[in-house]
Amino acid sequence: MNMSMGTNTERWLFVGFMIAFAVKAPMFPVHTWLPDAAENTTPGGAVMMVAIMDKIGTFGMFRFCLSLFPKAADWATPVIIVLAVISIIYGALAALAQENMMRLVAYTSVSHFGFIVLGLFALTPTSVAGANLYMFNHGISTAALFLLVGYLIKRRGSTQISDFGGVQKVAPILAGFLLIAGLSSLSLPGLAPFISEFGVIAGTWTKYPWAAGISAIAMVLAGLYIMRMYKRTMTGLPSPTVKEKVSELSMAERWIIIPLLALLIVFGVYPTPLTSVLNPDAEQTVSFVEKATGPNNATSEPTTITQGGAH
C-alpha cells in the first residue's frame, strides 16, 4: 500500500494503532483486564476471548502497524522490544504466583503474547514467521488448557488449586489430557508451540541477543508454573470431596479435546503445512519494512522456519 505522510503524522498514527492492539492482545502494561475477565467468564468464553479474539491484537500489529507505518515501527522498536520482554517475564512470574487456575492460564497468555510481539518487532524473517505461527499454536494450546481447567472447575465447584489433589487417581484420562495441554503451553519439544517459540527466540537472537536471552528464562518459569499446577491438582491422594465430585471426562468432552491435542502433536512433528504458508508472508513484510527504513537495517538472514526448526 502506497501512503504518503509526514514523520510526526506517521508516528502518532502508529502509536494510536499500537496502543489499541496492545490492549486487545493484551500486552504489558495494558494487560490488566485479562486476568479479571478470564476469572469471571465461563471456560468457553475464555477460549473465545484468549484463544481466538485476542489474536486480533497481534495480527493487527503485523498487518497494520508494520505494513502501514514501517518507519514509525522502526522508530518505536526499541521501546516495544523492552515492553515485550517485560511482558514475557512478568506474565510468567505472575502465573507462578496464582492460586486461581483461570487467572494462572490468563497470565500465561500475557507471557505468550509477549513472545509474539517480540518476534514481530525483532523484524527478522525467522522471528516474524515464528510469531505468526505462535498465534496459531497458542490458540490451540490455550483452548485445550482453558477447556480442561473448566472441566475441573465444573466438577469440583472451585477455581482454587488448593481445593484439588489426586485427580489422576479418579480421572486419569482428564489428568493425561491436562498434562499434554500443559506441556504444550511450556513449549515442550515435539509439540507445536515449541517450534514457534524457538523461531521467535532464534530470530530475535540475530538482532537483539539480550532480549532473546532474557526471554529464554520464561521457558524455565513456564515449566515451574505448569508443573506446579499439575502436581498440586493431579498428584497425591484425592480428598473425599475430590473422590465424590470429580469424575472422568465424558465421551462428548473427550471428542472436544482430542482434536486439539492431535493438532498440537501433528504440527509439533510436521509443521510444514503451516510454515509453507506463513514464511513467504513474513519474508515479504520484513523486506517491505527494510526497504522503507533504509539499507542500514537490512538483514542477511536467508530463511525462516522449516520442519527442522529455524535456520
Question: What is the predicted function of each stretch?
Answer:
Residues 1-232:
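Hydrophobic transmembrane alpha-helices and their helix-loop junctions in integral membrane proteins
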Residues 41, 171-174, 226-311:
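Cytoplasmic/organellar membrane-interface segments at the starts of transmembrane helices
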